[in-house]
């Protein structure tokens, strides 16, 4: 990723509170990834997933994706993802990992957190400098109290497995969903966009979703959460418009598109 964060711009964006490249990140997902990822193809070699809280790529690896690339509109999402990967690599136990996330949600100066030195030494230098420059600003105070979502964290067995399989940071693309299809040239067996389409204007939903189709290999899938009503119709319209796609699930706020050839 060629993006170089600017702490002055980040301060201004966070003060305004609008969606931006520096929007605050969640520390724990509120999505049941154990449920969602049962719909990932069993032989997934390559997956592309939104970062969110960093849990999406971790669980994609846990559920069998051999190579995982990531994207998000916010650089702070990359930061929380890399912090989690660094925690795994530095040998934090599950209790300390959970406590770190709860503290990240509430604190402004993360340089004083327990175990943070172990984390910092494993982060990219540019990211380390950014976090130090932003140490008086809350970067991860997003959403509700993360302890409400503790059930979505890895359990002891899953956490131990992640320590074994996550050996390096995930590749990251900083991008709005509407530009993602133009920025990525690789193709994938599974693309997980979660609930991003809740934030795409209704009249743009079909076009934006269509732009992602070229990222998917034959027999691959796109998973879309549809808490808002319009992503479901857009998924059905994709299947009606493109004869190499089918809409195979619309249940529990999940839509799945599958490329059949």
Regions found by a protein language model. Give the residues of each.
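S-adenosyl-L-methionine
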Residues: 1-43, 116
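Class I S-adenosyl-L-methionine-dependent methyltransferase module
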Residues: 2-8, 74-167
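A short acidic, Gly/Pro-enriched loop at the edge of an enzyme's catalytic core
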Residues: 42-45, 180-192
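Conserved class I S-adenosyl-L-methionine
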Residues: 44-53, 68-69
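A short SAM/SAH-binding and catalytic strip from SAM-dependent methyltransferases
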Residues: 188-203
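Conserved beta-strand signature within the Rossmann-like core of class I S-adenosyl-L-methionine
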Residues: 192, 218-230
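A short glycine-rich, Lys/Arg-flanked "PGG" loop and its adjoining helix->strand segment in the class I
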Residues: 206-218
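Core SAM-dependent methyltransferase catalytic element
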Residues: 236-261
């Amino acid at each position: 990723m060629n993006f170089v964060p600017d702490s002055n711009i980040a301060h201004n964006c966070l003060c305004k509170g609008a969606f931006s490249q520096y929007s605050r990140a969640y520390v724990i997902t509120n999505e049941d990834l154990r449920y969602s990822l049962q719909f990932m193809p069993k032989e997934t070699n390559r997956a592309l997933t939104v970062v969110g809280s960093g849990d999406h790529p971790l669980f994609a690896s846990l559920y069998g994706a051999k190579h995982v690339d990531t994207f998000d509109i916010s650089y702070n999402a990359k930061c929380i993802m890399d912090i989690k990967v660094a925690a795994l690599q530095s040998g934090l136990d599950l209790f300390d990992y959970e406590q770190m996330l709860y503290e990240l949600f509430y604190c402004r100066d993360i340089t004083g957190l327990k175990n943070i030195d172990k984390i910092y030494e494993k982060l990219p230098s540019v990211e380390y400098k950014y976090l130090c420059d932003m140490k008086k600003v809350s970067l991860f105070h997003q959403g509700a109290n993360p302890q409400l979502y503790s059930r979505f964290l890895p359990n002891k067995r899953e956490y131990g497995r992640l320590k074994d399989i996550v050996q390096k940071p995930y590749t990251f693309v900083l991008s709005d969903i509407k530009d993602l299809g133009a920025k990525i040239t690789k193709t994938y067996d599974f693309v997980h966009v979660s609930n991003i389409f809740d934030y795409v204007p209704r009249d743009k939903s079909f076009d934006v979703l269509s732009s992602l189709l070229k990222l998917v290999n034959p027999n691959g899938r796109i998973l879309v959460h549809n808490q808002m009503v319009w992503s479901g119709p857009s998924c059905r319209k994709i299947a009606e418009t493109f004869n190499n796609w089918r809409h195979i699930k619309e249940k529990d706020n999940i839509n799945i598109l599958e490329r059949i050839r």
